Amino acid sequence: MTELPVPGRPARLPRRALLRGGAAAGALLGLAACAGLEPPAAPSPLPAGPSPLASPAPSSAPGDAPASPEAAAPPATPQGPAAELVRAHSGRPEVALTFHGAGTRALDRKVLEALAHGGAQVTVLAVGTWLAQYPDAAKMVLDLGHELGNHTWSHRTMSRLSVADQRTEIERCRDRIAALTGGPGAFFRQSAAQHATAEQLRLAGAAGYPRVLSYDLDSLDWTDPGPATVCAQLRTATAGSVVSMHLGHQGTLAAIPQILADLDARGLRPVTATQLFA
């Protein structure tokens, strides 16, 4: 018997129709289970408040310029003020020949090869602009058995610079060396001064250099006085001396054989600064 609809009351399906609908739904669920399908989950309730939007991950467009070597360099670990090294007191018959790293690549290679062939290992304090001009210079220094350090980015007179500019000179060269070699270099040396100031020691330590390499003997080769004068200056070196010299000068190249012969005659061995202060 069919039930007639009553005005104002929702229509009700016949019991037989409900049973047929339930059976059909059960059959569909059974087929889904056999096929390994899961019935759709009930929708999750909306959160009470608006959810924060996630920031999209940065992406590099195909036309983006590559990062500069300075930007790619790993950061150094900040430390307290660096210690200034002027000369060693180990008593060993050793001296450190340390070179301002600048000049032309061809002449610099000749100087470094002459030192290596003469059995000398030296420390090259590189100027950052030199490394920028000759990106393979760092590898050349290391491949010849020498040591690399930081001699500021552009060799400005640091005592005339603001603290911020001094920091930039140190850190920019550090980052260039690290990008080329994987490390910041063995030492920092201030530019245009024999000794570091307290501020420069603090900045060097903050840049990750525990030691600043100053010197006790100036070879004067940067004034181009001639090989004889440079050799005469080197004859005043004693055990433990740190000697300041320069790449990029023809007179320095000409003086190398005699310098090494004089050191050998006095029983002094030229080593890297790291070896001297070990």
Protein language model regions, located:
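N-terminal secretory signal peptides
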Residues: 1-13, 25-31
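Residue-level preference for short coil/turn positions at secondary-structure junctions
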Residues: 14, 91-92, 118, 144, ...
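C-terminal domain-boundary segment and adjacent tail
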Residues: 46-54, 58, 63, 69, ...
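Catalytic domains of cell-wall/extracellular-matrix polysaccharide-remodeling enzymes
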Residues: 110, 157-264, 268-269, 274-278
